[in-house]
């Protein structure tokens, strides 16, 4: 099957022939800290659907430095430092941030807003997409591997 999506850097390639299982604009404080962006486009894939070429070249560190034992690890290239993906230690998902992880501008747009917190004082998004304080209500985490 041909690849629908491909990203990464000159040393590590990630690719998938499957659609993401979730595709949202994230408003969480962790994404803001890690990316430096006010909101972050995040796409989740089933763990086995996002393949990695040359995984031995990845450095892994906790995605959330305030919860270093959490399940998500930020994977970066050991040669150039490019962020490659988020890997779930439980084997459920792999996630990408298309605009900083080497994906082209044709990547599908986010379908909703996740982790919006009105207490931050940031105006509620009004672009016509649903807004949730967590992930969308019908999202089901894949089973652990």
Task: List where the protein language model places each region.
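A short Gly-Trp-Pro
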Residues: 1-6, 12-145
């Amino acid at each position: 099957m041909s690849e629908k999506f491909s990203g990464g850097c000159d040393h590590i390639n990630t690719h998938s022939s499957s659609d993401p299982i979730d595709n949202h604009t994230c408003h969480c404080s962790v994404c803001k800290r890690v990316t430096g962006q006010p909101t972050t486009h995040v796409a989740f894939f089933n763990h086995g659907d996002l393949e990695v070429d040359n995984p031995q070249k990845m450095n892994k560190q906790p995605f959330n430095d305030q919860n270093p034992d959490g399940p998500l690890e930020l994977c970066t290239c050991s040669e150039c430092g490019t962020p490659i993906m988020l890997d779930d230690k439980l084997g459920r998902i792999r996630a990408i941030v298309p605009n900083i992880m080497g994906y082209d501008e044709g990547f599908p747009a986010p379908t909703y807003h996740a982790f919006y917190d009105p207490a931050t004082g940031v105006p509620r998004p009004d672009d016509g997409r649903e807004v949730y304080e967590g992930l969308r209500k019908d999202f089901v985490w894949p089973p652990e591997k």
